[in-house]
């Protein structure tokens, strides 16, 4: 039921969300750095009764994959259901700032848009949920259940010391999330037209084929790994892995890199390397993809002196949140605020939802339009950020009242 105070106008939501968005966006929090964004959120959440803890994972002295990551877990209440907003304060690099119409960390309003890195992905989403929570708690201080925020600064990077580690801590102490709203920019043509109720899995591999180096004029004295690879690669690239289902397209395999050769035109190389990636549906498991890949390669390498090995990396399993209370809350809120009948989708890349869904939580991604994410001149419509805060507030009403 809709119980918001009539004074909760779109203008109020918009101004408050805009101000907080700008405060967050002016901090150049390129992965894995948070640059104080999480402290800003704590300052807003603590007066509402949130209890917070910062969780640090990784090496404080390291950089790259092993760098220390700061994470925030903040919660109000200790009862079920737990409605959690999951997001990230880190952003991707800007590239050459001279190519931007407005400097990427100036966070300025122009032509009806808020411009800057993190505008769409995803500091406005964090700001919108914070404002929605402030208004919801003010109007309903004795609401059912709990509200939580899980914020990391390691979503755009390796994603090894961020959400996945926080979830491990929560699981170890049996602290469960019931409904998880991931604030990734899910919308396509208009706010709320698409929500993600699942994501494909991602399985990558580096295939290295080893032969014997030699002179191209004496191939009988060498083993050409490229020649050994080609027949296997031909079959590998056209294999149908599954047909998909009602929620997911068919599993796809794409080759992104092939590296071989010494640079000389008269040398048979010793090795060739192929980088590939599966985006897979719930119709196929990681184990099945690995087994079928090895079956293809074993068949083709059986009659050659070349050998192969694969270095596998699983980035995430596929997940799907069927229609239920969380999806219904999204649909109702979007319809009430925008008049749009939203569409469910599992397209796109991976998100941190892949770490949360295996705990049993219902997970949905809902945020602003994604047309300019990771691009020069990233921006978001000013009108949308206020409406997003309204949508989030309506969802809290649907999930935690009555």
Curated annotation (Swiss-Prot):
Pathway: Amino-acid biosynthesis; L-lysine biosynthesis via DAP pathway; LL-2,6-diaminopimelate from (S)-tetrahydrodipicolinate (succinylase route): step 3/3. The keyword Amino-acid biosynthesis applies. GO terms for biological process: diaminopimelate biosynthetic process; L-arginine biosynthetic process; lysine biosynthetic process via diaminopimelate. Pfam families: M20_dimer, Peptidase_M20. Zn(2+) 1 binds at residues 88, 121, 184. Homodimer. The active site is at 90, 155 (proton acceptor). Keywords: Amino-acid biosynthesis, Cobalt, Diaminopimelate biosynthesis, Hydrolase, Lysine biosynthesis, Metal-binding, Zinc. It catalyses: N-succinyl-(2S,6S)-2,6-diaminopimelate + H2O = (2S,6S)-2,6-diaminopimelate + succinate. The keyword Hydrolase applies. This is Succinyl-diaminopimelate desuccinylase. Binds 2 Zn(2+) or Co(2+) ions per subunit. Catalyzes the hydrolysis of N-succinyl-L,L-diaminopimelic acid (SDAP), forming succinate and LL-2,6-diaminopimelate (DAP), an intermediate involved in the bacterial biosynthesis of lysine and meso-diaminopimelic acid, an essential component of bacterial cell walls. InterPro entries: Bact_exopeptidase_dim_dom (IPR036264), DapE_proteobac (IPR005941), Peptidase_M20 (IPR002933), Peptidase_M20_dimer (IPR011650), Peptidase_M20A (IPR050072). It comes from Psychrobacter sp. (strain PRwf-1). It is an enzyme of class 3 (hydrolase). NCBIfam families: dapE_proteo, PRK13009.1. Its cofactor is Zn(2+); Co(2+). Zn(2+) 2 binds at residues 121, 156, 374. It comes from the Bacteria.
